[in-house]
């Protein structure tokens, strides 16, 4: 009977740690989405009262990317070789 309670306790401990890990994953995803969309506005002030598109926002001839980014359907970080 003791072995049953030990096994049950270990199973509950594993289930609890798995639930905590899942909660952490969801929290990280929500934080990332908040940073990308909620806290960052689409337009950010640049020099001379112009506005630029941040990373991951769509861009075109009118909506230019911010400095250090290049437009490839959306703004991407510029990689120099």
Curated annotation (Swiss-Prot):
Expressed by the venom gland. It is found in: Secreted. Keywords: Calcium channel impairing toxin, Disulfide bond, Ion channel impairing toxin, Knottin, Neurotoxin, Potassium channel impairing toxin, Secreted, Signal, Toxin, Voltage-gated calcium channel impairing toxin, Voltage-gated potassium channel impairing toxin, Voltage-gated sodium channel impairing toxin. Disulfide bonds join 52-66, 59-71, 65-75. Residues 1-19 form the signal peptide. The presence of a 'disulfide through disulfide knot' structurally defines this protein as a knottin. Inhibits sodium channels Nav1.1/SCN1A (IC(50)=5.7 uM), Nav1.2/SCN2A (IC(50)=12 uM), Nav1.4/SCN4A (IC(50)=4 uM), Nav1.6/SCN8A (IC(50)=6.6 uM), Nav1.7/SCN9A (IC(50)=13.6-1030 nM), potassium channels Kv11.1/KCNH2 (IC(50)=4.7 uM), as well as high-voltage-gated calcium channels Cav1.2/CACNA1C (IC(50)= nM). Also blocks mechanosensitive ion channels (also named stretch-activated channels or SACs) and the hypotonic cell swelling induced calcium increase associated with the activation of such channels. It can thus be useful in treating cardiac ventricular disturbances. This is Kappa-theraphotoxin-Gr2c.
